[in-house]
């Protein structure tokens, strides 16, 4: 029987790197990719976001103005709550559709790559949860470099999420994705051997 494996971590811990490693053996249902589809130009969810936040929430081509929204919601808990209320159900529905589609292959497991796995309750449908970690200093540097953020802006984004220590405490498996990618690969391969036939 196919297992559902949750994959999460804090922002900039390198969860995407681990997801890519897992994708060599197992299908991935990526919540971020699904969100981009659900929140695409002209989609009902995008229209609801515009209705709530105003026209500045989209770019001229109809795509979400993600930098603007990101700055807004990472500095305003009520705005984040409103955005989540608009997007959660459409994304969850699309994810369930993707799980059903992936299960047609009858894999040993399906990876649910969900940044806010615990916050959105996905751990309840998972047989196991993998949490990707990195040190606070590494996370801060990665986020600043990746998103071109100041230290203060990067720290605000980190602080807006569930503390990584809480995610680690709830994990079945913890994968350290600090500075050494070879150790990360070894940990992922070791875990894969416990799941795949």
UniProtKB/Swiss-Prot annotation:
Protein name stated in the entry: Dephospho-CoA kinase
GO MF term set: ATP binding; dephospho-CoA kinase activity
EC number: 2.7.1.24
Substrates-to-products reaction catalysed: 3'-dephospho-CoA + ATP = ADP + CoA + H(+)
Lineage of origin: Bacteria, Bacillati, Bacillota, Bacilli, Lactobacillales
Gene name of this polypeptide: coaE
Organism: Lactiplantibacillus plantarum (strain ATCC BAA-793 / NCIMB 8826 / WCFS1) (Lactobacillus plantarum)
Segments forming domain DPCK: 4-197
Family to which this protein belongs: Belongs to the CoaE family.
Pfam families tied to this protein: CoaE
